[in-house]
Curated annotation (Swiss-Prot):
Keywords: Cytoplasm, GTP-binding, Hydrolase, Magnesium, Metal-binding, Nucleotide-binding. It is found in: Cytoplasm. Mg(2+) binds at residues 176, 196. This is GTPase Obg. It comes from Oleidesulfovibrio alaskensis (strain ATCC BAA-1058 / DSM 17464 / G20) (Desulfovibrio alaskensis). PANTHER family: DEVELOPMENTALLY REGULATED GTP-BINDING PROTEIN-RELATED, MITOCHONDRIAL RIBOSOME-ASSOCIATED GTPASE 2. Its EC number is 3.6.5.-. GO terms for molecular function: GTP binding; GTPase activity; magnesium ion binding. Residues 1-162 form the Obg domain. Pfam families: GTP1_OBG, MMR_HSR1.
C-alpha cells in the first residue's frame, strides 16, 4: 500500500438555509399573517479516527471535503431540512492543524484514540423566517433572515504512527531482523545500510494470552544530524513520539572498545535535540549481532556495561539468542508505561513533502 504521512486539504461546512418570506393565504383569509419557516442549519464536517486506515494517501487524491447546505424555509411555517454532516474517517494518530492566512498553524484536533469524533468545521445557522419579525408595529414583515455561511478551513494533516514500542538505532543495526523475529512483520532485510526506507509495523502476540498484543514500529536508521532532517530524520523521528518506550538497538560492529556506547549516545543526543520529551523517554538498550564476536569478547562487553552502570541486553537477532529476555522486558514496560505522552506542538512544522513512499504493514492474523 502507499504510505503517506502528511497531506493538505480543505474542509467546508454547509451554509445555513435562508428564512422564508410567506403569508398565510386561505379561503376567506386573504390577508393572513406571516408564516415563513426557518432555514435549516448547514452540515458539519466531522473527522473520525478509524483503525481501517493506515495512511493519508486518500487525502492526496481528494483534497476538498464539503458538507451539505441547509435547505431554505417554506410557507406554512415549514422549516428547511438541515444539511447532512460529512463524516471523514482518518487514521488513528492523525493530528489536524489549521493553517492561517499568514501561514501560521495551530493544532485543532488530535485523533489519538479509535472512534474519536471531532467537529472540524461547524455548519452555518439557518436564517429565521418572517414570522419571527411580526410585531405590533409591523404585522406584515416582508423580509427574513438569510442563512449564515459555513466555515472554510485550510488544514494540514500529519500522521504519527501509534505504536507501543519504537525501534531505533543507526543504519544496519539489525532492527528489521529483530522485528521479524518477535512479530509477524516481514520487512526487507539485507546487509547494507538504509534497507528500511519507511516505517514498518509489527504486532507481537503474547503466547499465553492471545488478546494481549504489542504494536512495534521499526523506524528507518538514523544518522548524525537527524534532528535537522539529515537522512530524512525529521520525517522518521515523529513516528516514535507517541510510543510508550523505545528499544534502542546498536550493532556490535559499531562498538568501539575505547567508547563502546558512543552509538547509543549519538542517537540519544539526536532525540534530545529533536524533542526534549522524546530524549527522556524510557528505553531498552540492546547490542545486536553478538554472533560476530567470540564469546569471551562479548563477556568483556557485558562486564564493561555493568561497570559503566548501564543495563544492556546482548542478543543475536539472527540466531534468536537473548531475545526472550528483551521480549520479557518489553512486556514489563508495556504494562507500566502510558502512551499518552506530551505533544510538542511548538516545534516548527515542516512543509508538506511531495514524495510518497511504499510501505508494507503486516498484522498478525487471529
Amino acid at each position: 500500500m502507499r504510505f503517506v504521512d502528511e497531506a493538505v486539504i480543505k474542509a467546508i461546512s454547509g451554509n445555513g438555509g435562508h428564512g422564508c418570506v410567506s403569508f398565510r393565504r386561505e379561503k376567506f383569509i386573504p390577508r393572513g399573517g406571516p408564516d415563513g419557516g426557518d432555514g435549516g442549519n448547514g452540515g458539519n464536517v466531522v473527522f473520525k479516527a478509524s483503525t481501517r486506515l493506515l495512511s493519508l494517501y486518500d487525502f492526496r487524491l481528494k483534497r476538498v471535503y464539503q458538507a451539505e447546505n441547509g435547505r431554505p424555509g417554506q410557507g406554512s411555517q415549514m422549516h428547511g431540512r438541515g444539511g447532512k454532516d460529512l463524516v471523514v474517517e482518518m487514521p488513528v494518530g492523525t493530528l489536524v492543524f489549521e493553517r492561517g492566512e499568514n501561514g501560521a498553524e495551530s493544532l485543532i484536533a488530535d485523533l489519538s484514540e479509535p472512534d474519536v469524533e471531532v467537529v472540524i468545521a461547524h455548519g452555518g445557522r439557518g436564517g429565521k423566517g418572517n414570522e419571527h419579525f411580526k410585531s405590533s408595529t409591523m404585522q406584515a414583515p416582508r423580509f427574513s433572515q438569510p442563512g449564515e455561511p459555513g466555515e472554510e478551513k485550510s488544514l494540514r494533516l500529519e500522521l504519527k504512527i501509534l505504536a507501543d514500542a519504537g525501534l531505533l538505532g543507526l543504519p544496519n543495526a539489525g532492527k528489521s531482523t529483530f522485528i521479524s523475529q518477535v512479530s509477524a512483520a516481514k520487512p526487507k532485510i539485507a546487509a547494507y545500510p538504509f534497507t528500511t526506507l519507511v516505517p514498518n509495523l509489527g504486532v507481537m502476540m503474547d503466547e499465553f494470552d492471545p488478546d494481549r498484543r504489542m504494536v512495534i514500529a521499526d523506524i528507518p536508521g538514523l544518522i548524525e544530524g537527524a534532528h535537522e532532517g539529515q537522512g530524512l530524520g525529521h520525517r522518521f523521528l515523529k513516528h516514535v513520539e507517541r510510543t510508550r518506550f523505545l528499544v534502542h538497538i546498536l550493532s556490535i560492529e559499531d562498538v568501539d572498545m575505547e567508547n563502546p556506547w558512543a552509538g547509543f549516545d549519538l542517537i540519544n543526543d539526536e532525540l534530545q535535540r529533536f524533542d526534549e520529551t522524546l530524549g527522556s523517554r524510557e528505553q531498552i538498550q540492546v547490542v545486536n549481532k553478538i554472533d560476530l564476536l567470540p564469546p569471551e569478547e562479548v563477556d568483556g562487553l557485558r562486564a564493561r556495561a555493568e561497570a559503566d552502570g548501564r543495563r544492556i541486553f546482548f542478543i543475536s537477532a539472527l540466531e534468536g539468542e537473548g531475545l526472550d529476555a528483551v521480549v520479557s522486558e518489553m512486556w514489563r514496560m508495556l504494562a507500566e508505561l502510558d502512551r499518552n505522552v506530551p505533544l510538542d506542538s511548538s516545534r516548527q512544522i515542516e512543509p508538506e513533502p511531495e514524495e510518497e513512499f511504499d510501505v508494507e504493514v503486516v498484522w498478525v492474523r487471529e
